[in-house]
Each structure stands twice: as C-alpha cells, then as structure tokens.
Design a protein with these regions (language model features):
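An N-terminal-biased, well-structured beta-alpha scaffold segment characteristic
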Residues: 1-48, 147, 167, 172
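Phosphate-coordination loops involved in phosphoryl transfer and adenosine-cofactor binding
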Residues: 22, 93-99, 168
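Phosphate-binding beta-alpha-beta segment of Rossmann-like dinucleotide-binding domains, i.e.
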Residues: 43, 50-96, 111, 115
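N-terminal Rossmann-fold NAD(P) dinucleotide-binding loop
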Residues: 106-107
Length: 172
C-alpha cells in the first residue's frame, strides 16, 4: 500500500497500525512533522518527501500585496459597473516591506520588494545581522519592524512557538 499526502496531514500511530500493508508514504514536502516517525520506523515504512518550490509562494504573496496596494478587487467590481479607475491605489516604491522569517520564501519576497524600490527590513528569532546584510536587508527588532513597515509579510512555519507571535494590536 502506498500513501501520498500533503505534508501537514496527520499520520498517527493509530492510522499506521490500521494500515497493515502500508510500505511507503510520500509527502508534498520534506518536514514530515505530522507523521509519527517512530511508529513508521518500527513498522519498516519508508517515508519520502518531494522537493518544495518556494517560487509559487513568493508569487502569490506578491499577487496579494499588489492586489491590496492597487485596489484590484474594488477596481474590478467598479469596471463591471461601468466605472473606470475610481481609486489611485498605493505606490510601493519608497515604502517599507517588513519580512518576518527570512528563510527561502522570505528572501524571495524580500528580493522582489527591493525590485519594486522598497526598503526591506526583516526579523526572526534567529536572524543574524550578517545574514540579513548579505541579502541586502536590514535586520531589526520585531517591534521596530511592526512599527515601521507599510507592508508586513510573514514566512514562518506555524508551530506552538510561532502561534500568536503577532497579535491584532501589533498591526494597528
């Protein structure tokens, strides 16, 4: 039996014990944090992951940022009602992009922000100043990022450590 799943799908001891013929699990990523690895190893179940692509995440992030900055939804609705460009939107050049989590995806988002002429600042608990500088980004404290950024983009794995890391009041 072969199981192909998203990497966040829980594969528990109960499920592994119920699948008596399971030999291989293939996930859509490499973290495999949702799999009971100990039980899988005991049952000689092989676990493989696929290489993830961060480009689609960065592209979607920028689609959403641009959509908000240029009022795409509102302008599309107005166009269908016969109106043309009722708002100006916001120019991103000269604005500040705050990236929380400067890993692969955060770095790609930061690179695109710089191409738009944005100042890019970043924070994560383990971000080293030299690493940020090597990427052309300024490392700042989380509070400073939240106070200065015109746009905040979060690129952290959701975990108990990161849950509630940023609250509503932090963004207002």
């Amino acid at each position: 039996l072969l199981l192909i799943m998203r990497e966040r799908t829980p594969i528990t001891t109960k499920l592994l014990n119920a699948c008596t013929n399971l030999k291989l699990i293939i996930t859509s990523g490499m973290r495999n944090q949702a799999i009971d690895l100990k039980t899988a190893k005991q049952k000689n179940i092989t676990i493989l992951g696929t290489d993830t692509h961060s480009n689609p995440t960065a592209e979607l992030t920028w689609a959403l940022i641009l959509g908000l900055a240029r009022n795409v939804r509102e302008e599309t609705e107005n166009m269908y009602q016969g109106y043309w460009q009722t708002t100006l939107g916001t120019e991103l050049k000269g604005k500040t992009l705050g990236v929380i989590g400067l890993g692969t995806q955060g770095t790609q988002v930061a690179t695109i922000g710089k191409a738009f002429g944005m100042e890019v600042i970043a924070w994560s608990e383990n971000l080293k100043i030299a690493d940020a500088e090597a990427k052309g980004v300024l490392a700042v404290a989380k509070e400073d990022l939240l106070a200065r950024a015109d746009v905040v983009s979060i690129h952290l794995v959701l975990s108990e450590r990161t849950k509630n890391l940023i609250k509503y009041d932090d963004l207002c």
